[in-house]
């Protein structure tokens, strides 16, 4: 299982420096939603890290999927 991080460049860069390989920069709410959907479907991702402020910009339908996700486990900071 791998860790994936999605967010603005400033958010993901620290995780890149820590060695997380699956980092995705998403600067717009549309790109964020698209990337989250793609990563949730990746069976190799066990933990998905998001910024709490980004979660609030997502469509409600995707927020519900995130709130109910067991795998990957989604952590907001």
Region annotations inferred by a language model:
Residues 23-30, 34-77:
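Core subunits and conserved enzymes of cellular information-processing
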Residues 1-31:
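N-terminal first-folded block
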